[in-house]
Amino acid sequence: MADRQEVVLSERERQCLRWVEEGKSSWAIGVILKVSENTVNFHVKNAMRKLETTSRTQCVVKARRLRLIE
């Protein structure tokens, strides 16, 4: 299981997860961050891989628990 010492999320991955936590879609996050929906999905999927999760919700919960997002 990934723990705090092993996991480093990029600033963009953290930004995307914060917006996912607010319930925003990838499209809406892309509009907010001025990037494409595919770019948002890329960052979210990278965070999911790093945190060894299988859903966006699990990823946000684990990132919050590990204090990777505030």
List where the protein language model places each region.
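Short helix-capping/turn signature of helix-turn-helix
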Residues: E21-K24, L66
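Hydrophobic residues on short alpha-helical segments
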Residues: R14-E21, M48, V60
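Regulatory hinge/linker segments at domain boundaries
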Residues: M1-Q15
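Short, basic, alpha-helical segments at the C-terminal edge of helix-turn-helix-like DNA-binding modules
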Residues: R56-L66
